[in-house]
Curated annotation (Swiss-Prot):
GO terms for biological process: calcineurin-mediated signaling; cellular response to calcium ion; intracellular signal transduction; negative regulation of calcium ion import across plasma membrane; positive regulation of mitotic actomyosin contractile ring contraction; positive regulation of mitotic division septum assembly; positive regulation of protein localization to nucleus; regulation of cell morphogenesis. This is Serine/threonine-protein phosphatase 2B catalytic subunit A1. It comes from Cryptococcus neoformans var. grubii serotype A (strain H99 / ATCC 208821 / CBS 10515 / FGSC 9487). SMART domains: PP2Ac (SM00156). Calcium-dependent, calmodulin-stimulated protein phosphatase. This subunit may have a role in the calmodulin activation of calcineurin. Residues 494-503 have a biased composition (Basic and acidic residues). Keywords: Calmodulin-binding, Hydrolase, Iron, Metal-binding, Protein phosphatase, Zinc. GO terms for cellular component: calcineurin complex; mitotic actomyosin contractile ring, intermediate layer. The keyword Iron applies. It comes from the Eukaryota. Composed of two components (A and B), the A component is the catalytic subunit and the B component confers calcium sensitivity.
């Protein structure tokens, strides 16, 4: 058995011998792709893709040559299409002037036909451009948008600035309603606040929030159709109820304003097995499901033909519900204008064109858009865990520079000057120190590996379908293999169902106050024409999920005998009754980008386990390596 001094000398000799290896020269200006193609690293790989706009516009570019008080619409359209940004002053000007126009409008708009009605946009700017191709040029087409311009998509601020600019140019023909996502609570929980802070500043975000509070809540189209974002409320009897709302504030979590932003038709709308008009909305975690009877009674009471709303993704881009018995017209219509929602729903989008008492649905498919790393992460931050893992792999390789056989070789050329340890206890202590150092390096390698895995999963939307049939991270991951696991619209919808709930209160590490409504002050494919209805007997599917946590604070109860929205809680399909108070939340979502906070805590917990040696996935090979190097007397016995 070779002595420790001999083994040390052998290791040094092995390192010296390997230091003479010639390092091959590498041309870093060229890179070979997986298909064998050689590309230049100093040029754009895909030359036919236009480079992003790397500058902010000058005042001469920004202002219109026709009217110096308004932005140049054509320039903005192209500039945003190239991912360009404005100066903060230019963005704030658009939000201020657009907000003033919105504030001057009533809660309930009255708009005439012909008109094009559009549903949710959700930050899909490139699809918004396609929408205008399908629906018509805003310069000569009347438009009504039903809300949800922001969140989920990564181009929300471009959608807002462009639509607000159009409002400045066409205040009498382009109308914007408020959706449930136009509030501080949801924009902080999802992506819009993060996007504003990344692309502009929190000042721009706050200006957006103030402007959102000016958005009208509803519209009557052609004196026949009520257009709202969500649905009906037990507090909504006549249209005058809408006119009396104080809309210049953050949406409450109960009451009429909440319901018209959050309510949905019942899942089995038109074939209900209940006599109730309103049932607790367990999918949203607040507001109500309204029934066919509730819709028919409201329409008859207000002499209207139908309710046009958005708020729910639709596979075909739209849905017509059961017809009323008196008019034979669909009682409710849902329009959704974000194609291939979240890049995985594979749904079509649609707009509703109403002209000369003829209603046509125009469908369109998604448009390719630039890719963003999760949560607007830069490539250096994204790649750091990968680099760290490789560095620790190199360090471990250095420690394992020679084999056990090389360590055991006897060679008279190396003098044995080092004294043999005489104290067995001291030798054991030294061996333990060496072993601990090697294991520490191994744990650091595990930490970097863990960080890399967590980076890969930052944007992943975890499936919580009881069967776990769908892999975690399918809805926001760019990996094609993960996307292929989703078979269709319903798979995507069921996996994303938790994100349809009213989020819990969350506290930003940079802020002292929770981002909740109560914390915010009150502030003053080729398109084709298709049949205008589809079979209304196909139910909307929606499976309630197990609640994750309770986090919503209680709101103010309604006055005695006044119907109030049950914000959250209770068993599914609980009928409203007088005095039905607000309860705590049954639901939250683990899957939005705001979970960066909770994901970070989880990652730190895992790292502590690894560093503390509690990680069950420890490297057995590293353990054996540490044992061999630190215990030379056992080297011949181990593998």
């Amino acid at each position: 058995m070779a002595s420790p001094a001999t083994q040390t000398a052998n290791a040094i000799a092995a390192i010296n011998n390997r230091s003479n290896l010639v390092i091959p020269e590498i041309d870093f200006t060229q890179h070979q792709l997986e298909n064998g193609e050689i590309v230049s690293t100093t040029e754009r790989v895909i030359k036919d893709v236009q480079a992003p706009a790397m500058y902010v516009p000058t005042d001469d570019q920004f202002w219109s040559k026709v009217d110096k008080t308004k932005p140049d619409i054509a320039f903005l359209k192209n500039h945003f299409y190239r991912e360009g940004r404005l100066t903060e002053e230019q963005a704030l000007y658009i939000l201020e002037k657009g907000g003033e126009l919105l504030r001057s409008e009533p809660n309930l708009l009255e708009v005439d036909a012909p008109i094009t009605v559009c549903g949710d946009i959700h930050g899909q700017y490139y699809d918004l451009m396609k929408l205008f191709e399908v629906g018509g040029n805003p310069a000569d087409t009347r438009y009504l948008f039903l809300g949800d311009y922001v969140d989920r998509g990564y181009f929300s601020i471009e959608c807002v600035l462009y639509l607000w600019s159009l409002k400045m140019w066409y205040p009498d023909t382009l109308f914007l309603l408020r959706g449930n996502h136009e509030c501080r609570h949801l924009t902080d929980y999802f992506t819009f606040k993060l996007e504003c802070k990344h692309k502009y500043s929190e000042t721009v975000y706050n200006a957006c929030m103030e402007s959102f509070c000016n958005l009208p809540l509803a519209a009557v189209m052609n004196k026949q159709f009520l257009c709202i974002h969500g649905g009906l409320s037990p507090e909504l009897h006549t249209l005058d109820d809408l006119r009396s709302i104080n809309r210049f504030r953050e949406p409450p979590t109960q009451g009429l304003m909440c319901d018209i932003l959050w309510a949905d038709p019942l899942e089995d709308f038109g074939s209900e097995k209940t006599n109730e008009n309103f049932l607790h909305n367990h999918v949203r975690g607040c507001s109500y499901f309204f029934t066919y009877n509730a819709a028919c009674q409201f329409l008859e009471r207000n002499n209207l033909l139908s309710i046009i709303r958005a708020h729910e993704a639709q596979d075909a881009g739209y849905r017509m519900y059961r017809k009323t018995k008196t008019t034979g017209f669909p009682s409710v219509m849902t329009i959704f204008s974000a194609p291939n929602y979240l890049d995985v729903y594979s749904n079509k989008a649609a707009v509703l064109k109403y002209e000369s008492n003829v209603m046509n649905i125009r469908q369109f498919n998604c448009t390719p858009h630039p890719y963003w790393l999760p949560n607007f992460m830069d490539v250096f931050t994204w790649s750091l865990p990968f680099v760290g893992e490789k560095i620790t792999d190199m360090l471990i390789a250095i420690l394992n520079c020679c084999t056990k056989e090389e360590l055991e070789e006897e060679d008279e050329e190396f003098p044995l000057n080092a004294p043999e340890p005489t104290d067995a206890e001291s030798a054991a202590e030294r061996r333990q120190i060496i072993k601990n150092k090697i294991l520490a390096v191994g744990r650091m390698s595990r930490v970097f590996s863990l960080l890399r895995e967590e980076s890969e999963r930052v944007s992943e939307l975890k499936s919580i379908s009881g069967s776990n049939a769908l892999p975690a991270g399918m809805l926001a991951s760019g990996a094609e293999g993960i996307k292929e696991a989703i078979q269709g619209f319903e798979d995507a919808r069921k996996s994303d169902i938790e994100n349809e709930r009213l989020p819990p209160d969350i506290i930003d590490p940079d802020e002292d106050k929770p981002a909740s409504p109560s914390a915010s002050p009150i502030m003053p494919a080729t398109p084709e024409e298709i049949p205008s209805e589809i079979p209304y007997d196909s139910p909307i599917t929606g499976t309630p999920r197990t609640p994750i946590s309770s986090a919503i604070a209680s709101g103010s109860p309604g006055s005695p005998g006044t119907p109030t929205s049950p914000s959250i809680g209770g068993p599914p399909l609980t009928a409203w009754r007088p005095g039905h108070g607000r309860r705590t939340s049954l639901g939250t979502t683990k899957t939005s980008p705001s979970t960066r906070r909770r994901s970070l805590e989880n990652t730190m917990h895992l790292i502590r386990d690894v560093v503390g040696g509690k990680d069950a996935q420890g490297d057995g090979q590293l353990e054996r390596l540490a044992e061999v190097i630190s215990s030379p007397t056992k080297g011949g016995q181990g593998e």
